[in-house]
C-alpha cells in the first residue's frame, strides 16, 4: 500500500460525497501503516496506530468510508456492531471473537489471492485429468516405430481442442474427485463459537484425502477438479503464516454503534452489554494476545476505527480509558440539499446510474433532468428535517417510491418509449412525491 494520503482521499471521493475531515484522518492513518513498515524492526515495534473515533449522524458515510478504505488497503477488515457483544461471563459473544473473525477474514482474503495466482496451472491440471477420463490409457508401442503413441497423441490433441471449445460440456464421464461429505452443522450457543469451530474442523479432518468416483458432466467435472487442483497447489502452512502476519500488521477493525454501549447519565439498571463491554474492549484496543485458529494474535498494531451517532449520549459518556485509546476524533457533518444533489449524480455507480442501467435491461430508457435531481434532493432534505434524519439512506426510499410505477410496468412501457426515454424532471418528482413530502403524517410512515 504505497498510495499517498492525497491519492487515498481522491479514491474515496469517487464513492463518498463530502466528509473531507474524516477522509483525511483515515488516509493519514493508512499511510502511517506503510510508513511504519519502512522503519527498522526495533523502532517499528514501538510505533502503534492512532485509533479513530468517528462521530456523526446516521447515513452520512461513516461505515462506507471504512469499507472503501479496507478495499484500498487490501488488508484484513471486519465490521462489527458493538451492541452484539456482552461482558465476559454473560450469555452472548465476547469481544475476543472480533479478532478470531478478523483472522478468518485474512485467511479467506489471502486464499482467494493465492488461488488467482495458480489459476492457470490448476486449469491445465484439470484439463489433463478430464482428458485421462475421456481417453483410454495410451497403448504400449508394439513392434517397430512409435506409430500408436503418435496416434494417441493426435487423438488427445483433438479432444483437447473440442474440450476447450465447449463441445464436450454435456458429455458424462466417471471421474475420481475428493470426497467432501456435507459438513457437520453445529448450532453454536452465544459465546461458544470457538469450541464449535474446533469440533467442525475435527469432523472435516476425518474425511480429508478420501476419494470417490462420481458420474458428472464434463463442464461440472472441470469446475470441480479445477477448484480441487487449485486448493492442492496452495501451501496451507505458508498461507496461515502470512495471514497471521497480515492480521497483526495490517488488520483493520471497524466497530459501529459504539455510542449504544456508552452509559447515559440518567440511565439505571444492569449494564451487561454497556460498561462491561467497554472494559472488555480496552485490552483489545490497547494491545493483548488472542488465541485463534492461526495461533496467538497480538493486537498491538491492529487499527481500530469506532463510530457512533451519539444523539442520545456523548463521547464523554464512554469510560475514560476507552476515550484515551481513541485519540483521533473526527466529526462528520449532516448532509445539506447540495450534498444530496451530488450524491445522486457524482459517485461512481451513483443511484441514478444504477436505476438507469437496471431499467435498460428491460429495454426502457429513463433520463434524470437537472431540475428533477434538484427537487429530489430538496425533498430528501425536507423529510429528514421533519422526521428522523437517516441521511443519504432517505434517497433509497424516495427513489423506490418515485420509480415504483415505472419499475412495475417496465416491460409494457418499453415498447411505448422505444424511441424516447422517460424524463424524470421536477414536475414528475412533484406529481409522485410532492404531496407525500408536504404531509408530515404521511411522510413519517411512507417516506
Curated annotation (Swiss-Prot):
InterPro entries reported for this sequence: AAA+_ATPase, ATP-dep_Clp_protease_ClpX, ATPase_AAA_core, Clp_ATPase_C, HslU, P-loop_NTPase
State its location(s). Answer: Cytoplasm
Task: State the Gene Ontology BP annotations.
Answer: protein unfolding; proteolysis involved in protein catabolic process
Keyword vocabulary terms for this entry: ATP-binding, Chaperone, Cytoplasm, Nucleotide-binding, Stress response
**SMART domains hit by this protein:** AAA, ClpB_D2-small
GO CC, sorted alphabetically, is: HslUV protease complex
- Give this protein's Gene Ontology molecular function annotations: ATP binding; ATP hydrolysis activity; peptidase activity; proteasome-activating activity
- Which residues participate in ATP binding? 17, 59-64, 256, 321, 393
Reading the lineage from the top rank, the first entry is Bacteria
Q: Which Gene3D superfamilies match?
A: 1.10.8.60, P-loop containing nucleotide triphosphate hydrolases
How does this protein assemble? A double ring-shaped homohexamer of HslV is capped on each side by a ring-shaped HslU homohexamer. The assembly of the HslU/HslV complex is dependent on binding of ATP.
> What does the function comment of this entry state?
ATPase subunit of a proteasome-like degradation complex; this subunit has chaperone activity. The binding of ATP and its subsequent hydrolysis by HslU are essential for unfolding of protein substrates subsequently hydrolyzed by HslV. HslU recognizes the N-terminal part of its protein substrates and unfolds these before they are guided to HslV for hydrolysis.
Q: Which family does it belong to?
A: Belongs to the ClpX chaperone family. HslU subfamily.
Q: In its UniProt entry, what is this protein called?
A: ATP-dependent protease ATPase subunit HslU
Q: Which organism is it from?
A: Pseudomonas paraeruginosa (strain DSM 24068 / PA7)
